[in-house]
């Protein structure tokens, strides 16, 4: 004879297990758990306006100088690092605009990063700081924005067009360049590139061996800059 009490007890136990294992399991990723420390910040988590100080130690700002002339194949292109610069960026979140950017570079902080001998490095840097930039006479290179426009491309990410006055070697000219801007909770990162002609700023490109080896007039700048609130 079947023990009804035992049978019903086992049946209830089986039903309880079935209910437990049928419940949905909580998935932290499904709830939007943060899986990246540097995930772009949502606009709702940022203040209305932001003021950021540029961090040169966490940034990269370089110049490429290219060789030209009949014997350019015997020369080398040079990569120059801008090491000492300060600045401030101001943005209005969601729309970006109005916004502003100011950057001050120490002229004597430009350094050659190519693999060359110490003596060659010194010669190149002495020429660059002395004959080209005249760093003693013009110790700072200054950029001040006049207009900044931007369009949103994703959460916390924008494509910006920045125009402003660049003062280099005692000459001020207007320049315009594109930059990507990504906002994080306590910082921003901007990346881009632009070109300049040395002659526009009263600089005569370096030339040796009767002009058979010389530096091209056009220089290419690229930047990856981090700024913190």
Question: Can you say where each PLM-predicted feature lies in the sequence?
Answer:
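Bacterial N-terminal signal peptides
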Residues: 11-24
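Bacterial N-terminal signal peptides that target proteins for export
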Residues: 2-14
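Low-complexity, acidic/polar, glycine-enriched regions of mature
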Residues: 26-229
């Amino acid at each position: 004879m079947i023990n009804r009490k035992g049978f019903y007890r086992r049946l209830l136990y089986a039903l309880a297990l079935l209910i437990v294992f049928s419940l949905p399991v909580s998935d932290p990723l499904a709830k939007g758990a943060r899986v990246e420390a540097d995930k772009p910040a949502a606009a709702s988590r940022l203040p209305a306006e932001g003021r950021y100080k540029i961090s040169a130690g966490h940034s990269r700002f370089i110049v490429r100088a290219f060789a030209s002339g009949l014997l350019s194949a015997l020369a080398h292109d040079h990569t120059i690092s801008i090491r000492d610069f300060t600045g401030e960026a101001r943005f209005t979140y969601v729309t970006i605009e109005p916004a502003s950017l100011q950057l001050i570079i120490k002229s004597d902080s430009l350094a050659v990063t190519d693999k060359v001998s110490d003596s060659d490095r010194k010669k190149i840097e002495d020429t660059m700081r002395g004959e080209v930039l005249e760093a003693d006479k013009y110790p700072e290179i200054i950029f001040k924005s006049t207009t900044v426009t931007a369009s949103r491309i994703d959460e916390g990410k924008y494509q910006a067009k920045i125009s402003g006055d660049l003062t280099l070697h005692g000459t001020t000219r207007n320049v315009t360049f594109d930059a990507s801007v990504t906002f994080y909770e306590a910082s921003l990162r901007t990346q881009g590139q632009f070109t300049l002609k040395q002659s526009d700023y009263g600089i005569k490109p370096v030339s040796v061996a009767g002009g058979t080896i010389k530096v091209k007039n056009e220089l290419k700048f690229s930047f990856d800059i981090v700024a913190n609130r």
